[in-house]
Amino acid sequence: MRTIEGENELLLTCMETPDGVSVLRCETRDDDVRLPDEIGGAPVVSLGGYALSERAPDLTGRDTFRVRVTCGGPEPVHDANAIRAVTLSKRLQSVGSYAFYNCRRLETLTFSGSLTEFGGDALMNCRALRHIRLHADPAAPTCLHRVLGEHAGELDVIFLHGGARIRLLFPAYSEELETLAPAHIFQRRIHGAGYGYRQCFESGVLHFRGYDLALESLLDRHDFSVAARVAVRRLAAPYQLADAARAAYLDCLRAHGGALARDCAAAGESAALSFLLSLGVLSREDIAAACDTAREKEQTAALSVLLAALGQNIPKGRAKSFDL
């Protein structure tokens, strides 16, 4: 068995392909898994079906070899539930069906623009997934639309390209099949604006104008909290943001930014509060309410930002009561 140094304890079952190496199985109990970019000088180009899943794939008859990736720890016994984050190989081209099946605690998936195929049900039962990190040009075709199509939950997506960070929110949606008796015809019903957001792609390229127009559907559904979070992300990194869309996002935050400010205050997100305040969309009442929340949650840094916006300072006596 080959052994290579890495950032994890992984036990890989691999197969050579014309383009490089395919990882058919990855056994680990690490929470942050980083697949190697190369094995034996050849690029890792595919991740097989069920590769990281709770269930092992049937590799009978395959011409495989094993690779131990180690950072000095013991040989791992696979635990799909331990996995919280996965970074795919830089030149990975395909992910097989059910690759992450029953990775129930998987929260973050990172991949590059080289990924072009994403198998059906690859994310089945990955209900904790919330973050996608994509190293790619947002103006180029990517596999993002396929990944989004495999997960109906809310996803926070970040494009990382040339030093830029373009952050987008794709809302959740749900669907159900309703039987129309007595003909036993099934009618598909979709609930939530997230499905519409997932249709904003043309030939694999995200259509930012279509994404921005989808804000109206969130407001029509009274999903004001989600709409505010969509708005603040687009305004923070206004890639291909038209003037009309910018105005719509600012109007959204004038109407619903107060609740977002309170959420940020409760979580101690000072940087987010500073940006929200810089937009000039919060009323003094909104800021005062966020101050009350920050005091209640003992978020001193957030309270400082908010009080500065009101032209006040934290009373020294109260500041001492916080756990800094």
PLM-predicted stretches and their roles:
Residues R2, E7-G20, E27-V45, A56-S94, ...:
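Structural signature of tandem-repeat unit edges
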Residues A242-H256, V281-A288, A301, G311-D323:
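Ankyrin repeat arrays, specifically the small/polar loop and inter-repeat linker segments at the C-terminal end
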Residues Y50, G96-Y98:
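Consensus positions within tandem repeat domains that build extended binding/scaffold surfaces
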Residues C291-Q299:
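TPR/TPR-like alpha-solenoid helical repeat scaffolds
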Residues G268-L277, Q299-A308, P315:
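Ankyrin repeat structural motif
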